[in-house]
């Protein structure tokens, strides 16, 4: 079994149970989860891995070419909205615990990171990430981008570079990944995954982890195709993944 070792600073996580919020350290959360779940073993699938990489390169390059007018138009709209950079980048944790810089269209005001600490008490996500309804940091253009998932399109560059895959567990920032088991890092992170099409941020942290582990166990070209199809349906139905 392949293992991944991470060494990040300790943080504190909040767990909701009804109206009760309990504070746990990362070590407590990890210890409790690992005690209830066996680590996932990564099965060797060399043929699948080669085909997956080829399809990632071909599909991401084709998508960038096809959507280039849209990408340029979105970039211009963001700059006109508040004169800031259209691209937002952030360090995320990828395969084998390696850091990489993820790209997105900027959907928030330029001081969004500085304002996040003041909003932590309003976090509605049951998973590892941060989400609140009517986030005041989101711009008018950004609201449209998020509703249509267009803000994620620059990650096609990450896929082309090899940092990510089209399908795989979503990558988190170091402090968030610290709260999660390392075995979800056995494969490349993806643009979409099981839990994004099966409940998204409404799922609990353990449910998201279970679905990531399910993908690692079931990964195949057919599984990837099914997730891609359901992701497209979610986007066109107005459900933000």
Regions found by a protein language model. Give the residues of each.
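Hydrophobic alpha-helical segments characteristic of transmembrane helices
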Residues: 22, 32-33, 153-159, 197-198, ...
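Short, glycine-rich, amphipathic interfacial segments at transmembrane boundaries or analogous
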Residues: 24-28, 88-136, 192-211
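A hydrophobic, helix-centered structural microdomain
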Residues: 43-113, 183, 221, 226-241
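Short glycine/proline-rich turn/loop motifs
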Residues: 35-45, 120-125, 135-138
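Cytosol-/stroma-facing membrane-proximal "stalk/adaptor" domains immediately downstream
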Residues: 178-184, 188-241
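A short, structured surface patch at a secondary-structure boundary
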Residues: 128-188, 227-235
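N-terminal hydrophobic signal-anchor/signal peptide
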Residues: 1-65, 217, 239-241
